[in-house]
Amino acid sequence: MIKQPFLLTKFTPFSSKSKHTLFTFHCNFSIKMASLTARTTPTVQNVPGLTPEEMERVCEQTFQRYESGGLGKRKGKGVAIVWFRNDLRVLDNEALLRAWVSSEAILPVYCVDPRLFGTTHYFGMPKTGALRAQFIIECLNDLKRNLVKRGLDLLIQHGKPEDIVPSLAKAYKAHTVYAHKETCSEEVKVEKMVTRNLQKLVSPSSGGIGNDPGSGNTTKLELVWGSTMYHIDDLPFDCESLPDVYTQFRKSVEYKSKVRNCTKLPTSFGPPPEVGDWGHVPQVSELGLQQEKVSKGMNFVGGESAALGRVHDYFWKKDLLKVYKETRNGMLGADYSTKFSPWLASGSLSPRFIYEEVKRYEKERLSNDSTYWVLFELIWRDYFRFLSIKLANLLFQAGGPQKVNINWSQDQTMFDAWRRGQTGYPLIDANMKELAATGYMSNRGRQIVCSFLVRDMGIDWRMGAEWFETCLLDYDPCSNYGNWTYGAGVGNDPREDRYFSIPKQAQNYDPEGEFVAYWLPELRALPREKRHSPGMMYLNPIVALKHGYTKKTGDSKTAFSSRRGRPEDNRRKRHGY
């Protein structure tokens, strides 16, 4: 593999050639944002809204809460490698803990894989735009700092993991490489190549025996599960028998499964082995991407310290968890929803930690529908990850899991108008401009622009999914492609009509036109009632809407999720919560 949180696309791994013109997408990371109620142009809003000193303090206090002297004396021998991928955190990192238990020295490594910065499978868009690249860079810098504080460091190597990891295992005579298991084909293929190349090596056993070619001991890759709230081994069914309907999955795991505790932290993970050159975290320009400044929108700060800071800020400092269910459908501002998804996608934030913080909040403050709803969203995230195992590459094919035969258009001019926010529909255009400028879009916005692309424009849903892959900070393949298959009507859901009426969505979720006026300044001077229907004051609509209003918005099943009604009535995944 967002991965709520990152990742690669699926299909023929790494060798695909673009069938369409390569998109030139120059992202940037200065993501700024408006306040919920501001009627004039707001200033930049950082997420989390804490100073660097506050984030560091919250991070250290959280780590201290999870430190345990009860882990016992370290008895392992030799060197173990921790191969970081989409698990860029110290807290609740089972791969890191297992390496500590089994060794006397840990070598943490991150591989800057050039394939992550290649092009998507079908339409040749950048796999990773500059915004997400910058976010990952910040995550790596923060991970390196936190590891150093705990007696380690982070080795940064540029190249393919299947070459780098076995080479390091041989050089440091490592007995085991620990990593978190991924679920989608490109990442799984890399895991298999790493395993195959490790098997060609002969290394010492964990008992510290020398590197004797006759000993027959090979370095092994040990994959652990740590990307979901519910552990895969605790599901009441195997993934091949996963229910096709989310509600059945949710009810089953809530009734029959327990969420495991976060792993404890030793006081120190050190020492590392002797390393001559730890390398450096790259700059965006070193990845062949261009960084540009923007002056509006949310500025997400990458890294575990920022992630823990956001949880603290949203739950405890601002006390917003208690109203989450009422505000989560907002579109403008940093605090209408948790905004945890970018850190979940990068693995900078553990879903089990969020679970434990929700339970602590319920114990110390209050328990209501809002506190439950955050967990409800995390179960959606779990569901799509487990579903990706069951569906494999069907998740990424035009017909989707249902193998539906639809004659999609791939009109490049029409698609470009959509991705650039030039459709003539202010609500669509404002959302697309926010995405390009910030790497983020509200859950409500994602539903609306998906419905418009596939229902009103008739464009191939995979073009939209790949553009989201380029742009989103919280991209992960399971959630992204799972949501798009549902929105396109080719997913596992038995209901097919997920049309979103733009006039109705505008009326319900941006009645004053503040969101569209913020992202489309040319509409700001118009009366509020005219901002969504500006007529000659705005671009001509690129297509006519198939429906003006529809009964299938609100509490019905829609593109990414409609967030009304009881949990039983919701069938869509939430992304960007």
From Swiss-Prot:
Localization annotation: Plastid, Chloroplast; Mitochondrion
Tissues and organs where the protein is expressed, per its UniProt entry: Expressed in the endosperm and embryo 96 hours after seed imbibition. In the embryo, detected in the root meristem, the root cap, the shoot apical meristem and the epidermis of cotyledons. In adult plants, detcted in roots, the whole leaf lamina, the stem and in glandular trichomes.
Region described as Disordered: spans on this chain: 550-577
Span of the signal peptide: none
Induction per the UniProt record: Circadian-regulation showing peaks at dawn and at dusk.
This protein's GO CC annotations: chloroplast; mitochondrion
Cofactor, how bound (note): Binds 1 FAD per subunit.
UniProt KW Chloroplast keyword: yes
Function: May have a photoreceptor function and might bind ss- and ds-DNA in a sequence non-specific manner. Lacks photolyase activity. Has a potential role in detecting the dawn and dusk transitions and, consequently, in circadian input pathways.
Family according to the record: Belongs to the DNA photolyase class-1 family.
Other comments on record: 5,10-methenyltetrahydrofolate (MTHF) acts as a functional antenna for the photoreduction of FAD.
The protein's name: Cryptochrome DASH, chloroplastic/mitochondrial
Gene that this polypeptide is encoded by: CRYD
